[in-house]
Amino acid sequence: MGDRRTISLPESDKILQYCSEIRMSPTSLLPSPSHSVANNLSGSVYTFCTEDNLEQCITYIDQELRTIGFPTVQAVSKNGEGRKLHLVSIINCIYELLQRNSQTMRSNEEVETQLLKINGDLEYLQSIHQRQKDQLEATKRENCALQERDRQMQCKNRNLLQLLKNEKEEVQKLQNIIASRSTQYNHSVKRKEREYNKLKERLYQLVMDKRDKKISIDVLNYVGRADGKRSSWRTGKTDAKNEEEMYKVLLNDYEQRQKQLMVENVELKKVLQQMKKEMISIVSQRKTKEKLEDSTGTVTSDIEEEIADSSKENLSELSCEAVREQLISSIRQQWRILKSHMEKLDNQACLVNVPTPDENGLIARAEHEQELDKLISEIQQCKETIRSQQQLLKQQLSVPRDDDTSKLLQDCYLLEDKERLQEEWKLFNAQKKNFEKERRNFTEAAIRLGHEKKVFEEDRAAWLKHQFLNMTVFSDHKNLEERKVPGVHFSSEQDNCRLHSRPHDKVLASSGDYSRRPSKALPITSSSKHSLTQIESISWRDSSISPNDTDFLN
């Protein structure tokens, strides 16, 4: 009975189980304190005190009570017979013990109720903790969704910026094309205006000449002058005067022609500068340089060089109009080639495999991870191949070789390059032969054209002489000239056919149609070159002046 009853609270890791056990046993189901005390007393009576050890039990209880602070339960008898039980002390001790027991029971009940409250608060806090944990997970998911949405919006923004940049480039290209076409249009309008003014002046001259004409005898097959007047008799003074007038007219024509050419050159330079700027802008934007490794690329470059050389040679022998047209056509051709090349590069860039996004514009995570794994595996394979190549190279360098084996290996390494160079040399020689052949054909055609022009000039001089003799009153001289030169008669139909055939021959010569071989090839000497230059100058002058002394180039 002297042992104190202490309450040991459970540990923190077993508090849930302890609380659940307490919740499952409410206060109504717990045994009452009176029942528990009665049971304990009934058990202790039979176990603690017996008739044999009564004195010892009394002594032990007395000692325990005194240690607790109670008064002794034994008192000395008055008779001196010894010590005996003091009932008043016993009753007081029992009462005090009962009071203490009731206090401890009340304190236990209070502790139990407080423990129940603490358990309820703990459950509430646990529910709040679980709720906060769920809210944290939900906020994390929302944050991930917002981050993914932000990334998608950034990707979409980048795509829109790229599209805007492409549209701006397209607009710039279209503006450049419009500007170049406007310059070409202005150039053509100015040329048409000049032609219109010349035709207007010519019409005015013809109308005024018709008004100034008097009634006279018309001569058939008459080659008129530029002013529409009849030519005077040929004397020394008239010849000198006519020569001076001819030189003045030629100088005026040359000056006008030079001015026109200068204006056209300025406009063409502007067009060329604009085209150059466009090409530089396109090339600088793309920054793509492709290496032509196969032989087809060298063949195309050689063909382009041959075309450029032939165009240069043709430019030196053609008139200004033909040179201008050929230059413009070559520039347009180069522009088309560059444009087609850039379109081809764009198509090749568009054909690159891109992972297809889903309906929301997102790439599946599994596909993304597969692509990453594939790239990582490819990187590992590349590293392994590089490592193996390094090891093989070290082994090859470490193995000693003699001079013969090293030379043999070098020859093996260079064999493929030698074969490729030999094939390129063969192709180059074949192209060179073709170029020499075309050059020879061109030279022969130029010589033949010069001879034909010379024959034509002789025929023309004879025809003019014949017409001049027909205009004179000396019929006897006419008959005499007919007997001396029987093959000089030309009808008007033959004259028209010959005059109409001249521009056709000129077009054939300027277009480069030299496939027809001449009947007889003549060697080129210094005198023949000089005669060719004279013939070309005469033919250019005659091409700009018609038989009626009119300028039909404009």
Curated annotation (Swiss-Prot):
Protein known as: Afadin- and alpha-actinin-binding protein A
Entry's Gene Ontology molecular function annotations: microtubule minus-end binding
Family in the record: Belongs to the ADIP family.
Residues passing through the membrane, by range: none
Subunit structure: Interacts with WRAP73.
Classification via Pfam families: ADIP
Record GO biological process: cell adhesion; centrosome cycle; intraciliary transport involved in cilium assembly
Coiled coil ranges: 122-287, 359-449
UniProt function note: Belongs to an adhesion system, which plays a role in the organization of homotypic, interneuronal and heterotypic cell-cell adherens junctions (AJs). Involved in cell movement. Acts as a centrosome maturation factor, probably by maintaining the integrity of the pericentriolar material and proper microtubule nucleation at mitotic spindle poles. The function seems to implicate at least in part WRAP73; the SSX2IP:WRAP73 complex is proposed to act as regulator of spindle anchoring at the mitotic centrosome.
Keywords for this protein: Cell adhesion, Cell junction, Coiled coil, Cytoplasm, Cytoskeleton, Microtubule
Keyword Isomerase included in the entry's annotation: no
The keyword Cytoplasm is assigned to this record: yes
InterPro entries referenced in this protein's UniProt entry, alphabetically: Adhesion_Centrosome_assoc, Afadin/alpha-actinin-bd
Region (Disordered): 508-528
GO CC annotation: adherens junction; centriolar satellite; ciliary basal body; cytoplasm; microtubule
Compartment(s) where it occurs, according to its Swiss-Prot or TrEMBL record: Cell junction, Adherens junction; Cytoplasm, Cytoskeleton, Microtubule organizing center, Centrosome, Centriolar satellite
Species whose genome carries this gene: Xenopus laevis (African clawed frog)
